[in-house]
Amino acid sequence: MESTTVLLATSTLLLVLHASYGQFPRACSTAQVLLSKECCPVWPGDNSSCGEVSGRGVCQDVVPSNSPVGAQFPFSGIDDRENWPIVFYNRTCQCQGNFMGYNCGECRFGYTGPNCTVRRNMIRKDIFRMTTAEKDKLIAYLNLAKHTISPDYVIATGTYEQMNNGSNPMFADISAYDLFVWIHYYASRDAFLEDGSVWADIDFAHEAPGFLPWHRFYLLLWEREIQKVTGDDNFTIPFWDWRDAQQCELCTDEFFGGTHPTSNNLLSPASFFSSWQIICSRPEEYNSLRIICNGTNEGPLLRSPGRHDRNRTPRLPTSADVEACLSLTDYETGAMDRSANFSFRNTLEGFAVPTSGIANRSQSSMHNSLHVFLNGSMSSVQGSANDPIFVLHHAFVDSLFEQWLRRHQPSLDVYPEANAPVGHNREYNMVPFIPLFTNGEFFVQSRDLGYDYDYLAESGSIEDFLLPYLEQARQIWQWLLGAAVLGGLITAVIATIISLTCRRKRKTKISEETRPLLMEAEDYQATYQSNL
């Protein structure tokens, strides 16, 4: 009864929506704007472009990254997403201070207030620590977003060439939820080549350094969109801690839908999500017709947890797998793609064995293993965001990224500046977002972006105190080891001299009091070395 009440109340909510995020601002989808290549909408607060009169931002030329990219995509100038968003727009709003948005009408993450000067930190909770009312509200919010047309954004239904270079706009309305399904599809879709074929080894959101910053930004935008659709500024994305899970704990009618009694691929009719229609789930069809997903409904949400290829994914990640992954010190290595060894990013993404860090294309682990395990809409990269479990899964992946950032304290220079796969260099604008943000801007700790995770916030104070000392220890451990070896040699020499001059005294019985002290010292050194 409580769940029904929440759903009805939320469904009848009077919406007052403001600037949003996504792909193409509705205000920039006309032929006039596309031909001018200037996407600098007016901020209603002062009726000036980008809120310039109020000092919120200015309309500026887009300056794409000129750093060389990797060899994975050996083409240039054939895909609309290259040097984003130059193909569509070469001028956009550049917001100042703590302002943000396609027209600088909002606050940056972590700030609020009329002038975006009030600092704010939100906590994302483990879904299994949420109250019944909170869970019901989450489901109601998702349903509302699924059935509410985004007032500020539209999706492209054709390439720039198919739009006749802007003179024939091809855009469509989309719901607030499906907007983010489409964004995930568009960033990961294959590229159309000039000879009529497609190039599959391209992805602006996966299989490269940008995987974690891109999804961090994506989740923040998704979270804020839900806040706007519902009018609930306190909403945060929950997460699913899947460490050591033996089954899909969220695949029940209480959460995101149990299994249909007569079909293993469908959801239980008792679940609200059984009526959901999915989009962008037919990449082979789009490629053969050389079309872009247009947001048309393509059938029910599919999920069949545990009925997957167990040779590829024998089990879900364990706590030991997670800890082994977090212990990797290098964010990115080698070719910076799915072949990277000892790369934290590649291991967390699931292309490398967590216990060794060695890439293995025959196995799907960590993040990838959940997509394979759920065995349905989640198992297709381009359409995986159709399943609402996607958001909770990626929120936990983001929390592991956060753990790594806090543990290793990397500088921005750790994120590769050049030679990463196309779209993944540090200064590359993330595809397909407007307003523009680079990969490097989200290679920062979550608290700098105004949010935290409940299980990290609870242990954060002790961790924050110890981290500087642990980092210093990591930096000097080799020096300490060398000093210990040198000290041992000196001690041996001195011992030899004493031995030659004091043979008789060496025969004296060692007192019982000294033995435990020496043993304790040896044990301490062994523990210290193993900890390092």
Curated annotation (Swiss-Prot):
Entry similarity comment: Belongs to the tyrosinase family.
Cytoplasmic domain ranges by topology: 500-532
Keywords from the UniProt entry: Copper, Glycoprotein, Melanin biosynthesis, Membrane, Metal-binding, Monooxygenase, Oxidoreductase, Signal, Transmembrane, Transmembrane helix
Binding locations of Cu cation B: H367, H371, H394
Organism in which the protein naturally occurs: Pelophylax nigromaculatus
Encoding gene per record: TYR
Cofactor binding: number and manner: Binds 2 copper ions per subunit.
InterPro entries: Di-copper_centre_dom_sf, Tyrosinase/Hemocyanin, Tyrosinase_Cu-bd
Sequence positions that bind Cu cation A: H184, H206, H215
Signal peptide interval: 1-19
Membrane-topology annotation of the record: Single-pass type I membrane protein
Carbohydrate attachment residues: N90, N115, N165, N234, N341, N375
Top EC group: oxidoreductase
Protein's name in the database: Tyrosinase
